[in-house]
Amino acid sequence: VLHTQDPTVDAAHADTGVCPCGSGRVYRDCCRRLHQGEAIATAPEELMRSRYSAFALGGLGDYLLDTWAPRTRPALTAEALDVRDSQWLGLEIVATQTEANRGTVEFKAYYRPILDPAAAIQVLHERSRFRCQGGVWRYLDGVIDPPPTPVSRNAPCACGSGKKAKRCCQA
């Protein structure tokens, strides 16, 4: 399945942009392959990273729906998933576990509400479950633990700059 996104987003990341998933690789050699249907995720962590990137880049609602297990997928439209109400700042993989056709990924995603740029950076800490059927990994569901909380202004910034949050993204 070919997934298209806003061409300006793609153009900005295609050649030299670092992938938002935190792998350190260039987007075209990382999650873009999955987003455009050139490859499929081979493990739960790879799928988790590609889904995070889809949320961060926006315009990839179809990809998010296609990688969500049909039995747990809510009645959302691709357009609803394309709404960018958060600025995604970073992804931290806490733990992964894969056994046969099941897997879990515990992660922390750092974000700030777009409508309130002065808001504190928030952390979404989730344990996501994945299932592989027919060689295709899909997101099942996730448990948020604990509920999203603000990041201290004195903590290292989630963007990875090495600066304190108050001197970087929370400035």
How would you label these PLM feature ranges?
Residues 2-14, 145-152:
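Short, flexible, mixed-charge glycine/proline-rich loop motifs
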Residues 13-17, 35-41, 149:
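Glycine/tyrosine- and acidic-biased, solvent-exposed loop/turn segments at the edges of beta-strands
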Residues 14-25, 153-163:
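Short Cys/His-rich zinc-binding micro-motifs
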Residues 18, 95, 127-129, 156:
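Short, surface-exposed charged micro-motifs
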Residues 29-31, 166-169:
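Cysteine-centered loop/knuckle micro-motif
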Residues 33-76, 81:
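Core segments of small alpha/beta cavity-forming domains
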Residues 84-123:
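Surface-exposed, charged secondary-structure patches
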Residues 123-150:
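Short beta-strand edge/turn micro-motifs at domain boundaries
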